[in-house]
Each structure stands twice: as structure tokens, then as C-alpha cells.
Amino acid sequence: MLIAFVGKGGVGKTTVSSAFALQLSKKGKTAIVSSDFMSSLRYVFPSDPTGLKVVEMKENEVSAAWKERYGNEVTTVLKQFFDVEPWIVDHIADSPGVAEEFMISNIVDLDNSGEYDYVVWDTAASSATMHLLMLEKEFYEHLDRDVKILLRLRDRFHTDKVMELIEQWKNLAKGVWKKLEETSFYLVTTGDELSLLQASEIDHDFRRMGLRIHDRICNRCKAETENSYALRIPEFSGTARQIVEMISSGHELKLPIISGKRNQP
């Protein structure tokens, strides 16, 4: 089960996602992963707690993984149009957006692996996350157009390998987007006016993309803040780990109901 926490920068997404990852680790095997290349998860969890795997992805590692997974396939496609030297794959792997797009695929693979009952996704600040999700959606739609174009150029190719690869990429992208549609997104905000405004914009953008916010969480919530949140978390003081443990022990995350019952291992 993939559970993601989204919201503007500075509202405490890492703290909240860490708290509920810790809570879920008591119910089943759990992983927490960040899509922020400057993640602070290891500051919260210097070592993995029992039942919880902390996964941080570095940009160079994600680019290298993309090259290993898709490098030969990209070369096969490009060679149908012009001569390709080995360095071109390195260039593509380091291009803006490639590592970010492949990161979502890695997170989905983590959930699909069956190794974990819960995968908690600590997203980057809202602008970066919305760009990431839109990139994934456009990638899928772009591949759909590519297939139609390549069908017109089919006679040019000496092999059906190119069409097979593009179809394979399209199916992979479709699978990733389907998983995002099934993901339980929790919108984290604070009670200040700017955070509430941006939370409303995030919710609107999610709806526009066909994704759904499962619940809203008010972090560092004041008594006068409107009472329309699934969870209201007061402001705590202490170290990052102490705050995470206080939230985890005092507030229960409401998981979505699947097939008439709560999704639990």
C-alpha cells in the first residue's frame, strides 16, 4: 500500500510522514522513501527502527539506475534514426527531469515488490512534487502519441524491436500512473493563511490530474484553526525524533477502506 504526504515546504511533511511510518511499522513491514534529493530522513532516523526501512535516493544513483535499466533500449531506438555514440546515453541520463521521472517508477517498484505492507512516500515541497506528477502524466501521454507516430514510420525500421520497446515503455508508464491513482495522498498543512491557500491550490491541481487527496492533516495546529481536518496535530517541542515519536504515539492515521475493510497485513 502506497501512502504519500504532500504539501508546501515547511509544513512538516517529513516529520508527519516519519511519525506515521513509525506507527505503521508496528502493524506491518514498512518502508519510508523521500523524493527530495536533499532528504532529511536520516536526520530523523540515523539507523532503521525495527520494522521500518529508510530509503533515500540520490540524484546520481537514480540517473545511474536509469542508464542501467534503459540505456541499451534507448540506444536501440535512436539507432533507427542516426548513428549513436555511447556518450549520448550518459547525456540523456543526466538531462533535466530524467532522474525525477524515474524516481517515481522506483517508488512504485518498491511498493509492487511485495516486500513491504506499507510504503510511505515523503514528497518534496509542493511545487517540485506537482511538477514531478505532471511530468509522469505527460510522459505517459507523450508515449501514446509516439506509438501513433511510429506506426506511420514503421516501414522505415528494419525490425519490430523499436515498436516493441515503445509499447513496453508505454505499458510501464501506464502502470505507474495507475498506481498513482490508487495511492492514498494526505495533504499536510499548517493553520496559517498562506499554507491554507496553497493547500487549496494543491487539492485543485490533484483533482485536475485525476488524483485524489484522501485526507487533510493540520500540523502545528492551533486551537482556533477550523475543525475540518482528519487529524489535528498540536505543536510539540523537542528533537526531531522526539516529536516524531510523540505524534506517532498520540495520533492514529486513518487508512482508506479497501474492499469493505481496512487494508492491513
Residue ranges of model-derived segments:
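Generic beta-sheet signal
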Residues: 1-5, 30, 117-121, 185, ...
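P-loop NTPase motor core
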Residues: 39-86, 91-94
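Switch/connector loops and helix/strand junctions flanking conserved nucleotide-binding motifs
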Residues: 40-43, 62-66, 127-131, 224-225, ...
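Phosphate/Mg2+-binding loops and adjacent switch elements
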Residues: 81-187
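Short, well-ordered alpha-helices that flank and scaffold nucleotide-derived cofactor binding pockets
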Residues: 22-26, 109, 204
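Walker A/P-loop NTP-binding active-site region of P-loop NTPases
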Residues: 3-62, 123, 132-137
